[in-house]
Amino acid sequence: MSQNLQLVIDTDVGLDDALALMLCLASEAWNEAKIHGVTCVHGNTCLENVCSNTLKVLHAAGRLDIPVFRGASESLVESPESRAEFYHGCDGFGDFQYPDAPDPDHHIQKDHAVSFLTKITSERPNEISLLCLGPLTNIALAIHMDPRFCTNVKEMVIMGGNIAGVGNITAAAEFNFHCDPEAAHVVLKSMKCPITIFPWETALTRTNISYRWRNDVLGKIQSPQMQLLNQAEAKVIARHYKDGWVQCDPAAAAILMRPSIASSKVTHYVMVELHGRHTRGAMVLDHINSQGKKHNVTIIESIDLNLYKELLLTAAKTNLSRSKIQKGQGEET
């Protein structure tokens, strides 16, 4: 268990990001973490939708006190032609009507996400853990803005990249890295802290939970967070019920919160392909040490699915509201 996790979440909130955010909120309710802020980035949908979706999650959890920052709206070099609306919906969050949605103009911080990232890490050097759930544009910009950022961050957990050439947006690339390959390249090349990567293939093969469990076990829990997620995922559940419920981002969050959930991991030196016609955005593992460089990431190969599901269930039952945390009672209700 990670004690006193000082956390910043960089995210492109869609469906699985929302569940990851809920896990982080539960960790704070259990007095295991402190969320210093959420930085929004383009990805699953446009930046404005991401900001709105983030606020909806925090509103449902009773945690609008957490600062939310508007970040990069497009990639460093070439923005993707399409987002992930085909899965997450036109608004990136299931296209359901959310009553009394928080007004971004009122709740989003005035500072830019990149300014916040460089500031919080300079004020708390070697204390901040970054959970990166979307394209890495904000992180790359923080590196360019303040090179000390590379050494000020304590650790990073990244959902992104692939290890066996299996893509989910192109034939060879994972979505987050494909959205901004140059940003992924800058981050993996420049950061000096430990980096853990939860890649697409691990999500695909190791977090494949049945929709029956999602719907009839997790989905039956009566809590504000599950009511929100049930509404947001209703169309996806109806469309993919016979398939597996593959959720990338909450697994990455779970590994940061409970490192023991990672049952198999390996270190590698990795690179990002920037020019390939068919492979742009793919993560390349240097299996034969052709670059002669030290390993720069730890890759999660497998997780303990039972521990992961237990964590999801416990978080789904937890009272996430700020009033509960202030009373020191963030346990199951």
Model-assigned labels for residue ranges:
Residues 5, 48-123, 296-303, 311-317, ...:
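Metal-dependent C-N hydrolase catalytic cores
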Residues 68, 187, 253:
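A residue-level signal for conserved active-site and pocket-lining positions in enzyme catalytic cores
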Residues 2-5, 23-34, 175-182, 194-333:
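Conformational coupling and interaction surfaces
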Residues 44-49, 76-78, 162-166, 270-288:
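Short, mixed-charge aromatic SLiMs
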Residues 53, 78, 102, 141, ...:
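Sparse, context-dependent recognition of short Cys/His-centered cofactor- or disulfide-binding micro-motifs
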Residues 81-89, 170-174, 212-215:
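Short, surface-exposed amphipathic charged segments that create phosphate/polyanion-binding patches used
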